[in-house]
Amino acid sequence: MAAGERILVIKLGALGDWVLATGPFAAIRRHHPGARITLLTLPAFAAWGERCGWFDEVWRDERPGWTRPFAWLGHRRRLVGACFTRVYDLQTSDRSALYYRLFGPRGAPQWSGIAAGCSHRHANPDRDRMHTIERQAEQLAVAGIAAVPAPSLDWLEAAADKLAPAGDFALLVPGGSAHRPGKRWPSEHYAALAQSLAARGITPVLIGGAPEAGILAQIARAVPAALDLGGRTSLDQIAALARCARAAVG
């Protein structure tokens, strides 16, 4: 692609979806080698965006509510003022599609996403039933990007030796989206799995944050051999642990 392009990639969250988007991030950078590429993401993932090497700039999306009109005006001013030549909306949510509307009827750049009227719309009616990796690959194919590599966190560097137990271990991550509890596997199933792993000489390592503290404590009580690292790991450290683990379930 031509040098001098200004590209915006939208990927807000959540954690799992952000990781799955690393393949598309790499593909977009390879497709636009001379472009200035900006990532719009949540503050929680901004540091990753700055470190991964695919972006020249990272914008933090504070996701202003409808009661903050001046914040929305500022958001629109920043988007329009950047003079983007193409946008890859990998979030493909109602909110990110609304960002397309902020450019106005005549000022929108080329746009890969689901917004009605955009130049490279992914209009597959079955897209919501596709796996994220396949869905994003098809979306980028519509925009002319044929090859999308597998997700990768190889650029993350963190030491796990101070956290990892001796011998074989497996990561158990019983948390999930707080507003979609139905997606979570029941804690008693994690406890049963932890017992099975421990019986095989594999230490269950429990991962989670403050919202999962109760669940982790419940599993740890049921399986004394488990190592509860709840609240003690950064995202980088979790990735480092995962590289050394025999398995991960979550």
Q: PLM features: residue spans?
A:
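Catalytic machinery of carbohydrate-active enzymes
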Residues: M1-G250
